[in-house]
Amino acid sequence: MALNLKITYRPARKADMPQLHNLIVELATFEKEPHAVCINPKQMQQWGFQKQPYFKAWVAICQKKIIGMAVYYFAYSTWTGPAVYLEDLWVVEAFRRKGVGKALFEKVRRAGLQKKCIRMSWQVLHWNQPAIDFYTAL
């Protein structure tokens, strides 16, 4: 990968769902659970772009290709109030350690702040040391 490739960030669009679905399958494969992905791009288009969408996403783009994603949704706790939950954060291997994951994480954090969320939550598999190191360094 050339060092001067420009990476841009924007909210995901309905037309992005096939590429996002591919990244979700890539993530699930990494997590040793490719069989667990039961949704398809058409369902993602429906559920993510209806009047009250079930999820939102930010994408990282390089040369017109989505190279990273952050999928999230808003939740509510009767104890603590509104929250944003980061469901998936994934960057294709060639673009890791270049600030893409951090930028996507920050986009979700800011979305939570705009909605007056009290907290941001996510989960990491106990064996995924690179992800644990990534989140610890934030």
Question: Where would I find each of the regions flagged by the language model?
Answer:
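Short glycine/proline-centered loop/turn elements that form peptide/ligand docking sites
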Residues: F105, N128-A131
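Conserved acetyl-CoA-binding loop-helix of GNAT-fold acetyltransferases
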Residues: V91, R97-R110, T136-A137
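C-terminal structural segments of small proteins and small subunits
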Residues: Q123, D133-L138
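A conserved beta-turn-beta hairpin within the catalytic core of GNAT-like acetyltransferases
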Residues: Y76-L86, R96, K116-I118
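Acetyl-CoA-dependent GNAT
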Residues: A2-I7, P11-P18, N22-G81, F105, ...
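Structural motif
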Residues: I67, K115, A137-L138
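Residue-level recognition of the GNAT/N-acetyltransferase active site
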Residues: V92, L125
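Conserved GNAT acetyl-CoA-binding A-motif
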Residues: G112-V124
